[in-house]
Amino acid sequence: MEFEELIELARDSYVGQFVNFADTQLKAYPEGTPEIKVMVAEDSGLYRGLYCADFITVDPEESESPRIIELAPEEEVTFEPIEVTLGEMEMTVEALSWHDMNLTLADAPMPHEGGGVQGIEAWFETWFDPDDVNVDLDSRFSGHIHSLIIDGDNLHVDFGTAPVQALIDLLLLIEMNGCTGVKVF
């Protein structure tokens, strides 16, 4: 199976489970809402302190404060590790967990305050869309990533309901910044 097909399969598997999850939560908590963006403490490690919760509700019997419920996918795409070349960048792909994708970068500046991968801010603005500038009112879900964590040479991304293009754009951005190796797990 080609890398592009694996990405599509990983995304489709996750989003299918997300649809079922959202339906189940809405039945249990009709006042709840899927995909709500929240700001958390800056020291949380989340990029710009932003996070999109899978589902938020208020359960009057338990508390008046919001309750976040996260999807724990039961299925994930499994395959033997593969090697993929993107321009000058060699990738070892061991796993594609759409809701919890980890990328370890080699030989590239990391995106962080004061420097790093050029363009990560614009990528985040596009694919997290903090101000909900690109909202498709005809779509049930946002089509955005749910979080980005930058930790040294590692990126951790919850791609949420974002399309495959979000991952492709991130990989292209990393490659354009001179990264010669990426491990995806």
Predicted regions: what they are:
Residues 1-185:
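Structured alpha/beta or helical-core interaction and ligand-binding surfaces enriched in interleaved
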